[in-house]
Amino acid sequence: MYTIMLKAKLHMARVTHAVLDYEGSCAIDGELLDLAGIRENEQIQIYDVENGNRFTTYAIRGEAGSRLISINGAAAHQAQVGDRVIICSYAHYAEHELATHQPALVYLQDGNQISHTSHAIPVQFA
């Protein structure tokens, strides 16, 4: 049996472009893709913190170092420039992989600069 687990997350990215007439997808700065371990053409989920929209698309490589987050095609209706988004990818893991699985978490700050990275989400307290 396989379990779907969080593989990677870009937390609080800022949308820099929303291009309706582009072929589709989400262009992400290549450095951020590599750091998170998200592959080009990999399915991603995007959660817009500003409006609550959640949608699925795929990642394409943006210019390295540009800090680009471009929501393209029909998905451009779901997010606006300046919106904070959480970009996640998930993968299927076999039972024997679960004990050692650690997601790649990349936390971003203003200008989509890297704040820090982690492999565990902090425990939430009541």
From Swiss-Prot:
Its EC number is 4.1.1.11. Is synthesized initially as an inactive proenzyme, which is activated by self-cleavage at a specific serine bond to produce a beta-subunit with a hydroxyl group at its C-terminus and an alpha-subunit with a pyruvoyl group at its N-terminus. The modification Pyruvic acid (Ser) is found at residue 25. Binds 1 pyruvoyl group covalently per subunit. Heterooctamer of four alpha and four beta subunits. The gene is panD. It catalyses: L-aspartate + H(+) = beta-alanine + CO2. The keyword Lyase applies. The lineage of its organism: Bacteria, Pseudomonadati, Pseudomonadota, Gammaproteobacteria, Oceanospirillales. This is Aspartate 1-decarboxylase. It is found in: Cytoplasm.
